[in-house]
Amino acid sequence: MPEWTEKPGLLFVVATLLPILSFGLLFVAAALRWGLRPYAKENNGVNGIFQLLGGEVTGRGPAYVALAGISLAFVCSLVGFVWFLTEVHEMHDLEHELIHARVVHPDKHEKPEESKSNSQVRYNILRDNWRGSFEWARIYSTQAKDIERGAILNLGFRIDMLTAVMFMMVTLVATLIHLFSIGYMSDELQEIVEDHEVHTDKGHLQRRGRYGRFFMFLSLFSFSMLNLILTDNLFQIFVSWELVGICSYLLIGFYFERTSASNAANKAFIVNRVGDAGFIIGLLIIWTYFGTFNFQEIFTRIRCPEVDYHGEIKIDKKNAAHQFIRGNITPETGRSYSAITLDKGGDTALIFPRVTKGHWDGPSSRTVASNEPSATEYSYIPYWLLVAAGLGIFMGCVGKSAQFPLQVWLPDAMEGPTPVSALIHAATMVAAGVYLVGRCYPLFTPEVLLTIAYVGAITLFVAATVAVVMTDIKKVLAYSTVSQLGYMMLSLGVGGWTAGLLHLLTHAFFKALLFLGSGSVIYGCHHQQDMLKMGGLYPKMKITAITMLIGVLAIAGIPLFSGWYSKDEILAGAFGFAMKNQQHFLLFLLPLVTAGITTFYMFRMWFMTFTGKPRDHHVYEHSQESPWTMTVPLIVLAVFSVCVAWPMPDSTGWPLLDAEKSWLGHELHHYNQPEAVNVDFKSALASAQDNHTIVGLLALGVVGIGLAFASLLYYYGVLDPNEAKEQFPGVHRFLTCKWYFDELYSALIVRPGIIIAHWCRSFDANVIDGFVHLLARWNLFTSRWSGRFDKGIVDGFANLLADVSYGIGNWLRNVQTGYLRSYILFLALAAVGIWVLLYAWAAALGGG
């Protein structure tokens, strides 16, 4: 067990555990209040403890506990991030120095255990500072040759640049959402809350306030996401993955008395289980062929290592580092080995040894792989299973990040409180899917990556078109999130690893800003969400309006705002890929067009909410700016929405207008981007860099068109949107019905499922239960006849024997007279009888 106290990486572990500590405290307090409530009125001592724990109305105590936990987590993350930055540069330089030494002077590393350089020792110390794990459970393999090859379930952490910046983003955004929630959820502070959305026979529903419960769930949600980011293995990710799903279910269905909220929670949970089914299949394949869930071990065994004994691995005189090595199997009859002939289109992928010692050579044109490999032997996996493993993991990400065709749950998730929507859409649940795709990138084959790209492209376009016609302010943002997640997936699929994850980070800030801004509007308008009843709110809600405008500019990709740096990189990467693979030009065209659509519907939302004349005077007259606990988070998020991706000043000045020099993007690219990206997409990345300026100008032109249309329709009123609806009623209906995905799934899955369920119930009731009832009646019938037979025949015969015995006994009782002369007479008669018998017997014998 390593000396954990010397690991600065433990700051991130502490940051992860603080929210779960808040959850534990709130859970224990709630449980004690529940247990003490029945006795509080009867006993003064119990009542004192009950009041100490919050009493009937808990007040803001739970919010402060939850806020303290996540705020301290942010502080730990900030300190850890700064500390990591001071060491990552040295660690990166040492790594390249060691690799260079092995390439140039391979003979020096024949016996590394005897010739460790100072650089190697220093590198090991720095690397171990930021990782640690312990074995939680091991399921041993049945393959006796490698006793270590089994399912090793570790609990551990590994900090790299992606982990560090994700921690900063999640803890900061979650802290601001917690602060915002203190004001937004104030209605839940009442002992009795009247829910105007739920009607009963006695009027509106009345229930207890759930202020403490909300912050308890929020803390658990934050912990689940932080643990998912922290871990170094798929097993721990899957546990956190399911925890995130449970928390989303609890928070989306927070107002569970409302049918719409209950249905939305169920829908989110069920749709995500569909994706998780694929995730589990992927995990099982990885477990079977790799014997571990550790990311680094999987990646180093499925991708060709960088160096061998000769200093560099070459196949067909070409550098093979960081590539999949494929081939065809030639089984050896009666042996546990198979020969693999290397072939770029082979049906098998080589799995490299877990341990390489001494004079280790890379794969040759005909490599021997074991069917039951030891730690130092090659193995193999059918290529189609490797593809299936990647698709399975991606299927889980499709569900979690609401990608086509499992995007239907996310808009319905708006039934939860608005701060929950902000947390789900910005920093936790939907971010988890994109994060996992980025983390598992070296595992994905070209077929899987192309699938990811097309799924992202379809999603971003479909969701954007639906957002154009939405009138619920939260629904607009929901479809916007689905669309932006599609951008991230598209980028990852075409080799834009850095751009996709940079957009994940920038999107978190401006989407949290937009959702909290919409929450401020809803709160100020007394829970009105329909934009058709808003308008002209700018004078009354200036802080909310200005900060939301900053969010709109960022998501539209206006230069100098954070979204511009990441979205420009995505479009450039898509263009580079399309230029090298012209049959996939749609992968550039769709995101380019959608950039204009995004600008249109986001400015449409802002204009309809804050400009023009009030469309509902009752809403307008009662609207007001939100309290400081809600506006301060908006201001902080607005600042980050502008500058989080800015480049750092250099010797030439401050290149703010150079999207390729984003500081955050540079750090991710330089210290974290997998080498597999450069190998798989070398020419596409070069083309993207060469054409970045042209693509950027194209994108700005499309954004300008979107802004112009939104202004003409909803600000200046030159064009009438109602006329467009009348001219294209079919298109409007199609988009309003969300491309009929819900209806399609209802027709193909839900209704047939219900019909089958009813048929099964009918079959069970009429056939199975009927057969069981028939057997029961038959058993009842036979039991009755059995009872009669038992009573009449068996018991009758037994009773007859008893009666006969009883009669004989009674008769024999007459013999017992008690007189001596009677006994002498019986003895005499007995003697005569015996003599007669003996005489007859003797006569018979004599005659014989």
For each predicted feature, which ranges?
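Transmembrane helix-loop-helix hairpins at membrane boundaries of multipass inner-membrane proteins
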Residues: 1-6, 10, 31-212, 216, ...
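Membrane-interface interhelical loops and short amphipathic "cap" helices
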Residues: 1-11, 53-54, 85-98, 114, ...
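Generic start-of-chain signal for non-secretory N-termini
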Residues: 1-25, 33, 116, 835, ...
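Membrane-entry segments of alpha-helical transmembrane domains in multi-pass membrane proteins
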Residues: 2-21, 57-68, 151-170, 210-217, ...
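Alpha-helical transmembrane segments and their helix-start/interface "positive-inside/aromatic belt" motifs
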Residues: 10-16, 57-73, 266-279, 539-549, ...
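Hydrophobic alpha-helical membrane-insertion segments
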Residues: 68-88, 275-290, 548-559, 633-660, ...
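Aromatic-capped, Gly/Pro-kinked transmembrane alpha-helices
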Residues: 90, 112-161, 650-701, 712-848
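Hydrophobic transmembrane alpha-helices and their helix-loop junctions in integral membrane proteins
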Residues: 175-237, 246-625, 646
